[in-house]
Amino acid sequence: MQQPRVESDIIGAGEGPQRAVPWSAWIIRQDWVRWWVCHIPRSWTQWWNTSGWRQPLQRMLWGLEGTLYLLLALMLCHALFTTGSYLLSSLWPVVAVMWSHLLPAILLLVLSALPALLFAASFLLLFSTLLSLVGLLTSMTQPGYAQDLDQ
């Protein structure tokens, strides 16, 4: 089956929908390069190709970036501080009531953990003493350890 032939004029009217072209295609088209060569002075392209301008520009952009990050950090600190102080002022009665109930529980927890902590500390002290005694005894058994004290 043969397709019907469609007549078109010079701008392509009558050819139907064109296929989709990616947006990046305009960079690699020859028309863009030709326009660049014709309209941009050679001194500009030489300046663009030299690397002398890039380093100061990069330093300036890094400084600007650092300043913006510092400003952002200050704004975040200010927002957190103001929000936090507002929340603390509104939640202070709740915190006071919770603290009055939690303080005895925390004290009881600490006091009940004291015997275990004392046992662990005494065990570690005993263990380190035994290790140092073993080290002393093993070093005394070396042949070069015994010295004549009369000399």
From Swiss-Prot:
Q: Which UniProt keywords apply?
A: Membrane, Transmembrane, Transmembrane helix
Keyword Cell wall biogenesis/degradation present in the record's keywords: the answer is no
Pfam families recorded for this chain?
TMEM239 (PF15841)
Cellular component terms (Gene Ontology): membrane
Q: What is its main location?
A: membrane
Location comes to: Membrane
- Membrane-topology annotation of the record: Multi-pass membrane protein
Q: Taxonomically, which superkingdom?
A: Eukaryota
InterPro entries assigned: TMEM239 (IPR031694)
Q: Does the keyword Nucleus apply?
A: no
User: For this UniProt entry, which segments traverse the membrane?
Assistant: 61-81, 85-105, 116-138
Q: Mind telling me what this protein is named? A: Transmembrane protein 239
